[in-house]
Amino acid sequence: RDLNTVLNKIATYATMDRETAEDCFYVLRRKDANGNDNTIEGLSIRMAEIIAGAWGNLRVQTRIIGNDGRKITAQAVCHDLETNFAVCKTVDRRITTKTGKTYSDDMQVVTGNAASSIAFRNAVLAVIPKAVTKRVINEVKKVALGQAIDVETSRKNCLANFAKAGVTEAMICQY
């Protein structure tokens, strides 16, 4: 595995445009026990999918392993076939309201899918070392926050510079 190639793929996919870069992160607002607002943020399932695809030689599987009427349990296994390192992660999600009423069948499916996605993300991020991806993740975050140029903007700037020299997009494509 060539780490430079992996990191370049992650950066290319995740910074295609600002919207894609934004999809690589999640932010949740929650109240703590004292009623104070807390912000929870991290890498999204989309970023985990991009990292897993770029990493290569990786097998990831998710499945629902339990539904006891109160919670759904999802499990994900991620196996790096090059290093033979594997991780199994489980995620529980409640399927009852605050008053104890069980979610509809439809909402249980949605909750199960969400739990599977979270388990997938957790397993992938446990197998692929953060030390390897930290730098590129920071670059993606800059694009998401509008502090860096995404691939599409970079392409437009490049074409504009060529146009100043009399080179058209058609000429570039033909070349």
Regions found by a protein language model. Give the residues of each.
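Polyanion-binding surfaces on beta-sheet-dominated domains and ring/shell assemblies
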Residues: R1-I72, V77-Y175
